[in-house]
C-alpha cells in the first residue's frame, strides 16, 4: 500500500547551499523530517547548478520519510542572468534596465517548458516575454 502524504512543502533554495538554518529548518522541522538528510540530498542533486535558485517540492509522508522534486529556476532569475542585471526595474513601463535577444528568450523558454502551462515553445516564449516585460527588460531581434 502507498504511503500517505501528510504535507507538501514548497521552497526556493540556492543550488548546493541548503542548510538547516531558516527557511529550511523550521519548514521541515515542524513535520518531523530529518533536516540534515534533506540538505545533503538537495545539495548533491543541485551541485552542478551552483548560483541558481532551484525551487523544490517536498512531499512528507506519515512515517516522516520524504521525497522531493526539483523544478526549473524561476523565469525572473534566468532573465536576470541572461540580461546580466542585478534586479528588475521598479518602473518597468518607464525605465528599462536591460535587453535580451530572441535567441536568449527561446533558450529560457526551452528551460522553463516542463514547468510552464504551455504546450509548445512559442507559447512558452510568450509567457517568458511577459515576465521580461514586467521586469523592465526589452526583447530584441
Curated annotation (Swiss-Prot):
The protein, known as: Large ribosomal subunit protein uL11
Keywords: Methylation, Ribonucleoprotein, Ribosomal protein, RNA-binding, rRNA-binding
rRNA-binding keyword on record: yes
SMART domains per record: RL11
Pfam families: Ribosomal_L11, Ribosomal_L11_N
CDD domains: Ribosomal_L11 (cd00349)
GO MF terms, alphabetically ordered: large ribosomal subunit rRNA binding; structural constituent of ribosome
Quaternary context: Part of the ribosomal stalk of the 50S ribosomal subunit. Interacts with L10 and the large rRNA to form the base of the stalk. L10 forms an elongated spine to which L12 dimers bind in a sequential fashion forming a multimeric L10(L12)X complex.
GO BP, sorted A to Z: translation
Post-translational modification comment from the UniProt entry: One or more lysine residues are methylated.
Protein role: Forms part of the ribosomal stalk which helps the ribosome interact with GTP-bound translation factors.
PROSITE patterns: RIBOSOMAL_L11
One GO cellular component term: cytosolic large ribosomal subunit
Similarity-based family: Belongs to the universal ribosomal protein uL11 family.
NCBIfam families to which the protein is assigned, alphabetical: L11_bact
Amino acid at each position: 500500500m502507498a504511503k500517505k502524504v501528510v504535507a507538501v512543502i514548497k521552497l526556493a533554495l540556492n543550488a548546493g547551499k541548503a542548510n538547516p538554518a531558516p527557511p529550511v529548518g523550521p519548514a521541515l522541522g515542524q513535520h518531523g523530517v530529518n533536516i540534515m538528510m534533506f540538505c545533503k540530498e538537495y545539495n548533491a542533486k543541485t551541485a552542478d547548478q551552483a548560483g541558481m535558485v532551484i525551487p523544490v517540492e517536498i512531499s512528507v509522508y506519515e512515517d516522516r520519510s520524504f521525497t522531493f522534486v526539483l523544478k526549473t529556476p524561476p523565469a525572473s532569475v534566468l532573465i536576470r542572468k541572461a540580461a546580466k542585471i542585478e534586479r528588475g526595474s521598479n518602473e518597468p513601463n518607464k525605465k528599462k534596465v536591460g535587453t535580451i535577444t530572441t535567441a536568449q528568450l527561446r533558450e529560457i523558454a526551452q528551460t522553463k517548458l516542463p514547468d510552464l502551462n504551455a504546450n509548445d515553445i512559442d507559447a512558452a516564449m510568450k509567457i517568458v516575454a511577459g515576465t521580461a516585460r514586467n521586469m523592465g527588460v526589452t526583447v530584441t531581434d
